[in-house]
Design a protein with these regions (language model features):
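A structural motif corresponding to the C-terminal end of an alpha-helix
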Residues: 3-11
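Central beta-strand plus flanking loop segment that forms part of the substrate or channel wall
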Residues: 150-163
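Flexible, charged surface loops at secondary-structure boundaries
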Residues: 5-6, 121-123, 176-181
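Active-site/binding-pocket entry motifs
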Residues: 134-135, 158-159, 192
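Non-heme iron-sulfur electron-transfer modules
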Residues: 1, 13-43, 55-129, 133-153
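Rossmann-like NAD(P)H-binding beta-loop-alpha module
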Residues: 45, 170-195
Length: 195
């Protein structure tokens, strides 16, 4: 991803939604809604001071909510762009106008708590379709103990646990007590073939 971010022919737009596409191969016009980050990508030096002083602690979605992070944060170390962002749903200023600690902590003056969404119109030559995936309903997983037994984790949660950059630095430990797992049952394709 970092190498992609350096390409002069590729523009990475995060926190965005594709609204419409018109045109033909080699000549498309795309309308994109870019949601606010509340931290200017061009000014942010990724020093982390905004997160260091942010008083709000939230579940870390990148680590499948197995850990916590500050509300002013970068999703992961190799994120592109490298700038931090603020989740408006959990921001004390956005919800109660009660805090601006991050603004005074940021020496680069990159924080803009008034940033608005932008509508972009892009002329592009090619489209890379990345449809993503849907999460399985927790109801399907309940019969296997998920949500009731703390050591039952999803495949994505297990992936974060085994990753060297994950919350346990690749050590497979039980969420219930932080001890090493001695036996593991790996159930695959749960809910995938359900109609």
């Amino acid at each position: 991803l970092v190498e992609t971010g350096r390409s002069p022919n590729i523009k990475i737009i995060t926190k965005a939604e594709l609204i419409s596409v018109e045109g033909d191969v080699g000549n498309f016009t795309a309308k994109v809604r870019k949601n606010p980050r509340y931290i200017d990508e061009d000014l942010c030096t990724a020093c982390g001071d905004c997160g260091k002083y942010c008083p709000v602690i939230i579940s870390d979605n990148y680590n499948e909510t197995l850990t916590f992070t500050k509300n002013a944060h970068r999703d992961y170390d190799q994120a592109v762009p490298a700038s931090f962002h603020i989740d408006p749903a959990n921001c004390l200023y956005q919800n109660h106008e009660a805090c601006r600690i991050c603004v005074s902590a940021c020496q680069a003056k990159a924080i803009n708590l008034y940033q608005q969404e932008e509508m972009l119109e892009l002329n592009i030559g090619a489209i890379i379709l990345v449809p993503g995936f849907g999460r399985i309903s927790e109801e399907v997983l309940e019969k296997y103990g998920y949500g009731r037994l703390p050591d039952v984790v999803t495949g994505m949660e297990f992936e974060r646990l085994t990753s060297a950059s994950g919350p346990t630095m690749g050590k497979i430990i039980r969420p219930s007590d932080g001890r090493h797992a001695k036996r593991i049952a790996f159930l695959q394709c749960i809910g995938v073939r359900d109609l």
